[in-house]
């Protein structure tokens, strides 16, 4: 630097000395504990009324915790079950 004020070439030269190359490779390794587990299937007993005659219907399912919550939402809102007796009546309509 010559003179009282720094010029742009002087500043750029000073910055170039500070720039360090950065290694962008990831050397991280996952341990066995961090690997994703298989979803656990748990047996559940579902008891719901027939949508026509209110007789109890029992279902045994095997599901993940997420799966059983999804099934519950369906049975409470979008899907209704029909007993075998009412199914026969529907078949003849």
Swiss-Prot record:
A motif (LXCXE motif) lies at residues 24-28. A motif (Nuclear export signal) lies at residues 68-76. The lineage of its organism: Viruses, Monodnaviria, Shotokuvirae, Cossaviricota, Papovaviricetes. It comes from Human papillomavirus 15. One of its GO terms (molecular function) is DNA binding. Coiled coil: none annotated. GO terms for cellular component: host cell cytoplasm; host cell nucleus. Keywords: Activator, DNA-binding, Early protein, G1/S host cell cycle checkpoint dysregulation by virus, Host cytoplasm, Host nucleus, Host-virus interaction, Inhibition of host innate immune response by virus, Inhibition of host interferon signaling pathway by virus, Interferon antiviral system evasion, Metal-binding, Modulation of host cell cycle by virus, Oncogene, Transcription, Transcription regulation, Viral immunoevasion, Zinc, Zinc-finger. The gene is E7. Residues 1-42 are annotated as: E7 terminal domain. Pfam families: E7. Plays a role in viral genome replication by driving entry of quiescent cells into the cell cycle. Stimulation of progression from G1 to S phase allows the virus to efficiently use the cellular DNA replicating machinery to achieve viral genome replication. E7 protein has both transforming and trans-activating activities. Induces the disassembly of the E2F1 transcription factor from RB1, with subsequent transcriptional activation of E2F1-regulated S-phase genes. Interferes with host histone deacetylation mediated by HDAC1 and HDAC2, leading to transcription activation. This is Protein E7. Belongs to the papillomaviridae E7 protein family. A zinc finger (unnamed) spans 50-86. Highly phosphorylated.
């Amino acid at each position: 630097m010559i003179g009282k004020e720094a010029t742009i070439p002087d500043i750029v030269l000073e910055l170039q000395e500070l720039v360090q190359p950065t290694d962008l490779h990831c050397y991280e390794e996952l341990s066995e504990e961090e690997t994703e587990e298989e979803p656990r299937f748990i047996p559940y007993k579902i008891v719901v009324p027939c949508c026509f005659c209110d007789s109890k219907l029992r279902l045994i399912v095997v599901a993940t915790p997420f799966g059983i919550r999804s099934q519950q939402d369906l049975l409470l809102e979008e899907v209704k079950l029909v007993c075998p007796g009412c199914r026969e009546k529907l078949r003849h309509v």
